[in-house]
């Protein structure tokens, strides 16, 4: 069963393999990261871990039984009890409820980071992401600037987190 794990240095190679294997798939929904991202991946990964240690973000990877990365789920711009959620899942597990289960779990974990509100933006043509957010309790909160989602028109979604959230049960995953 996949496990959501806090990002650490030891995940670097599996995350890079995940990003490379799914590059074309991700580019259908968001802007491509460009060759420079992959060429400088090690530096980027280290910088992300430094930001995480400083409390600016909280990054997680969904790890499969074979230790491969099935998805990335991140809380960015953490401040004043609010964070921006970003996520992506491997094409091979898309449409199987993996993203929904992980986003729900991350909503539970967000309280550990002192968060009360999560926001996420998705393009109008990314219906799957809209469904994930809706199933995880997010509601539309207004238009997203195309600069926030790779030049596409979209919507911001928001979820207010309740105190004492319980982790999702097996039937909710």
Q: Where in the sequence are the language-model features?
A:
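Residue-level recognition of the GNAT/N-acetyltransferase active site
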Residues: 86, 90, 121-123
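Conserved catalytic-core motifs of GNAT/GCN5-like acyltransferases
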Residues: 121, 139-158
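Conserved GNAT acetyl-CoA-binding A-motif
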Residues: 110-122
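GNAT-family acyltransferases
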Residues: 1-84, 92, 109, 150-173
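Conserved acetyl-CoA-binding loop-helix of GNAT-fold acetyltransferases
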Residues: 88-89, 95-109, 127-135
